[in-house]
Amino acid sequence: MKYWEQGKSCPVVATFGLHPIVFALSHTKIAWEHSELDNVGGVIGGPLEILRGPLTGLPIPASSEIAIEGEVPPPSVESRAEGPFGEWPGYYSGGTLGTGEPQPVIKVKAVYYRNDPILEDEAPLWPGAVKIDANPASGILWDQLESAGIQDIVGVYNHTPYLTVVAIKQRYAGHAKQAGHAALTCSAAARNGRYVVVVDEDIDPTNMKEVLWAMMTRVDPATNIDIVDGCWSTPLDPRMPPSKRESKDHTNSRAIFFAVRPFEWRDKFPKTSRTSRELREEVVKKFGNVIPFPKG
């Protein structure tokens, strides 16, 4: 924006065929003014090798299969209709269709490539929200929750941007509500969301079977669901009404489910009829080659 505000073109680099962790961190809400490339190094266990673009001076991951250097003129100077695309929610969206505006263009100045480049692509997929087996946003959200003063968090998981689950060991009345509303507002989960679920420490937040069981047995719909309106959303939201999209009011509502034992009478809550996690793991390990135990 600082270039466009001065009427100048903004130098850019577009890279293709990246390490999957580079892609994962590129759209993760890390701390402001922190480098995504530095965070990649922290995840892969060593510095990410980069080159400086000869024309722009911008960093280019050295393992990229293709890299393009160029500049983006202000949209008022040049822009074009684009899209829609098969986006992560599982619908055709984005581009001009999503924003109602023409999109910026890149004036290509140089192209660098490997022979026979291998590209990592995604066809339009349904039901959407396909993920690689790396979820840095969950760890970042956990850190942000603890920084916000939320105590005794035992697990955090973003199943998709639409569903965040936080497991806590309840310490005081209102603890679950505090955790749920904090998860809703921390930057790692604030945008594109729909549902937040708070569960007790006996529930594995990564296991949807356990999370759904907690929601079905510990949530009283009249008292354990909070609705929060006016939250940070995106033009890619398929449920956004046309009127809000046209006025560029890219906000939505969220639901927070408190799927926990009520703190005030948690000691009187029925005991679960399940063996301990440790015993289950021991049995599966001992008899797994004989009995086809269901996963999860």
Indicate residue ranges for each PLM-predicted region:
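Internal mixed beta-strand/loop scaffold within catalytic domains of large alpha/beta enzymes
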Residues: 1-13
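Core active-site phosphate/anionic-ligand binding loop and the adjoining beta-turn-alpha structural block
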Residues: 14-18
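Charged, compositionally biased interaction regions
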Residues: 19-296
